[in-house]
Regions:
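Conserved N-terminal alpha-helix of the aminotransferase class I/II PLP-enzyme fold
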Residues: 7-54, 76-77, 81, 87-89
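Conserved PLP-anchoring active-site segment centered on the Schiff-base-forming lysine
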Residues: 64-82
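Conserved C-terminal alpha-helix-loop-beta "cap" of PLP-dependent enzymes
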Residues: 68-69, 258-332
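PLP-dependent aminotransferase-class I/II
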Residues: 92-127, 131-136, 141-148
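Hydrophobic beta-strand scaffold residues
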Residues: 95-96, 160-162, 272, 299-301
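Active-site C-terminal subdomain of aminotransferase-like
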Residues: 103, 127-135, 140, 177-280
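Catalytic PLP-binding core of fold-type I/II PLP enzymes
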Residues: 141-171
Length: 333
């Protein structure tokens, strides 16, 4: 989904926004309309800040929520921990503490075990729990799992952030509206992605906890995430939300992942590494099979020790492509 292009309706919206001039830095009608789209999802009391980059959205959110003496508790597979080049540590100056996960998810019980040194002057103080929805291995937290984690976090004075780079895929997988497993469960802030689901380059920070709204616009600028021509970020979101395009895109991607998993199930030379719950399929394969397949297709081996590969499906992945790919996998046996 990182390699796919832009949905035609999003591209059309960009072209329409590219006519004439508009006030910069978000003082334009497109940004106001996009913010209204978010309020329609989450309620009028939320605050939304559009940004160009996913890593920037996460780091900006973290930087507003905690201080340098805090630690962020996250899954050992969390993108913010493994794949953002130390951006959190460099910008926020805090420690990332990974918690062993099961299929990419942490539990309330596992979280509790990391809250034993609260108040100690010798240790970084846990200040934030960072969740990813859907996870880095395409699994999905249930509302019950999120609520349990939020309850433990808040009871111990920690805030909760959700990295929603693929939040649409999670919403489709759960079959419920996005507010019901974020704001309504007490999540304090989230990154709301779109780039991986048919947009060109736009993300957003959605703030539920009003304590974090003050000075956010200034921090966004200081953290290099204030776009001058904001209307081009906003126009994408307007098209993205119109007529449920964001859910339609995610539903197709999820369905293609399920189709691929079904087609390769039973093949003796491949093994599912994680449950297929959104738009990714992770499998264990022999090194020679990986090498042979990579000569035809572009994909990554994400866990070399287990020879686990990652196949992500997108809004524009066709059923024919999936069946052709599955046939190539079958031919390796």
């Amino acid at each position: 989904d990182n390699t796919s292009g832009v949905h035609p309706k999003v591209m059309e919206a960009l072209n329409k926004a590219n006519v004439g001039a508009a006030e910069p830095y978000g003082d334009d009608p497109w940004t106001a309309e996009a913010e209204g789209c978010f309020k329609a999802l989450f309620g009028d009391d939320v605050d939304v800040f559009l940004v160009p980059l996913g890593t920037g959205a996460n780091v900006l959110g973290f930087n507003r929520m905690i201080r340098s003496w805090h630690s962020i508790l996250c899954s050992d597979m969390a993108h913010t921990h493994t794949s953002e080049s130390g951006a959190v540590e460099a910008v926020v100056g805090c420690k990332m503490t990974p918690i062993p996960s099961v299929h990419g998810k942490i539990s309330a019980g596992a979280l509790s075990a990391y809250l034993t040194d609260m108040g100690s002057p010798h240790h970084s103080q846990p200040g934030l729990v960072a969740l990813t929805q859907s996870t880095e291995v395409a699994t999905v937290y249930t509302p019950e799992e999120i609520k349990a984690i939020v309850d433990v976090a808040h009871a111990n004075g920690l805030f909760v952030h959700m990295d929603g780079a693929r939040i649409a895929n999670a919403a489709v997988a759960l079959g419920c509206d996005v507010r019901s497993f974020t704001k309504d469960l007490g999540v304090d802030m989230m990154s709301f992605g779109g780039t991986k689901n048919g947009m060109m380059m736009a993300e957003s920070v959605v703030v539920f906890n009003k304590d974090f709204v003050r000075d956010f616009v200034t921090l966004r600028k200081q953290n290099l995430q204030l776009a001058s021509k904001m209307r081009f970020l906003a126009a994408q979101y307007i098209a993205y939300f119109k007529d449920g395009l964001w859910l339609e895109n995610a539903r197709h991607a999820n369905n293609m992942a399920r189709l691929l998993a079904d087609l390769i199930s039973g093949m003796p030379h491949v093994e599912l590494a994680h449950p297929v719950e959104s738009n990714g399929v992770f499998v264990n394969m022999k090194p020679e099979h990986i090498a042979a397949l990579q000569r035809q297709y572009m994909f990554h081996e994400v866990e070399p020790s287990a020879h686990t590969v990652r196949w992500m499906l997108s809004f524009n992945t066709s059923e024919e492509q999936v069946r052709t790919f599955a046939k190539a996998i079958g031919a390796l046996a």
